[in-house]
């Protein structure tokens, strides 16, 4: 974990700094990283406004989503809110038997439950697994999320299992996977295009901006004044992932999937 984190920090530092100084070949850095970890690294960087691909590596290959799927999940929830099919203020109750091993926020509210908004906040900002599973139950489970993604034009991303099983990340298993290209394009649709209302787009970005888990990755190497809204993921077999919206001057300019 520590070695992979240091490699990612080095990669992201090289990617972010060029915007302010001398360009660096990101692909060369990624290939060097692959040689070091004896594994694959998928990467896509696109322009936030146009969706144009700025740089990529293995962008069409499948990689496990792990907890990064929680951004897509909350995007699906917000679409239902926009359509009047869900309310962020609706309270969902549960009991101790519903709790996953990693439930930092939901474990504190067994008595009173949590609202849909609070569950989305918990799923994204602390990666609370129980929050994610409770939210999945409101949209038809993993199949429901996959169906939603197909409706946005994403024909690659798929969710097949609940937390924590989806983090198995077994090599060659296509369950619970996406491609860097598909994830980046879907994020661009959710965060900048008309899939969500402006109010819901801002809500989703605000949850990502409050991420309390991704500090050691992007946030620790960003130049001063840059904005970031992100979500990280970790799974078995050394799998790690991050999706992020970031840019200089406090304004979003690119989407990165790694």
Give residue ranges: language-model regions:
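Short, glycine/proline-biased beta-turn/loop segments that scaffold the active-site neighborhood
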Residues: 83-108
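Beta-lactamase-like hydrolase cores
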Residues: 19-64
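Short, Gly/Ser/Thr-enriched beta-strand-loop segments that form substrate-interacting elements
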Residues: 215-258
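Bacterial N-terminal signal peptides
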Residues: 8-15
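Conserved catalytic neighborhood of penicillin-recognizing serine enzymes
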Residues: 99-134, 142
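Active-site-proximal alpha-helical segments within enzyme catalytic domains
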Residues: 68-71, 174-209, 240-258
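Active-site SXXK
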Residues: 51, 63-92, 255
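Mid-domain, small-residue-enriched loop/turn segments at the edges of structured enzyme/sensor domains
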Residues: 40, 120, 133-192
